[in-house]
A protein has these predicted regions:
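Alpha-helical transmembrane-bundle signature of multi-pass membrane transport and export proteins
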Residues: 1-203
């Protein structure tokens, strides 16, 4: 019998930990969006580059999903989530080095790499949910996950905009990197009982 949202959440400590790590990572992923837009407009004034940035981020996220699915089947899912977060700490901080129009394509490239890593995290997280949640609770868990994704997207972008307007882009990127660090720390104690798909391995 499917549990209600509150009962499910209160009775699944491992899911709560995974959910918290994921929401914080999602907030970080979208927190820097406004800061990146601001840098592009400040240094280039190009609406075209804004479109390129958004397109690159979305295309790389979408096109990488089949490969990410294979990785989630063949590799440790907790490890994929942890290390994708760790890698994004340095990448987020690297945006602080942007200081002119000549850095715009580098900015777009780094942002695209972050979305690739975000895709790795999201796919591994979704694949990990059945490892820590009873089958009858998967619908509830997936509903919470979908709602959290949409909420984190909007909230992360909004908070990023507030920080940029009050404290500047450097502060936004520092806070952004801290969200990935915090998400990684939350993941450390999490135990995910995963059976590696041996059929996916090569000879």
């Amino acid at each position: 019998m499917t549990k209600g949202y509150i009962e499910f959440f209160s009775s699944n400590p491992r899911y709560r930990r995974l959910w918290a790590a994921t929401v914080i990572s999602l907030l970080g992923e979208w927190f820097n969006t406004i800061a990146l837009f601001f840098l592009i407009l400040e240094y280039s004034g190009s609406e075209f580059l804004l479109g390129v940035l958004f397109s690159v981020r979305m295309l790389l996220f979408g096109l990488s999903q089949p490969i990410n699915g294979l990785l989630a089947d063949r590799l440790n899912r907790k490890g994929l989530m942890f290390w994708s977060n760790i890698a994004q700490i340095g990448l987020a901080l690297s945006f602080i080095l942007v200081d002119g129009p000549e850095d715009m394509w580098w900015l777009i490239t780094v942002s695209g790499i972050m979305m690739l890593l975000h895709g790795v995290y999201v796919t591994a997280e979704r694949a990990a949910v059945p490892n820590i949640v009873a089958e009858e609770d998967l619908i509830t868990a997936n509903a919470i996950g979908s709602a959290s994704w949409s909420t984190a997207l909007c909230t992360g972008a909004m908070l990023g905009g507030v920080v940029v307007s009050e404290y500047g882009t450097d502060a936004a990127f520092i806070i952004d990197s801290m969200t990935f660090l915090l998400s990684s720390i939350i993941l450390i104690p999490l135990v995910i009982e995963q059976k590696i798909d041996e059929s996916m391995k090569g000879p």
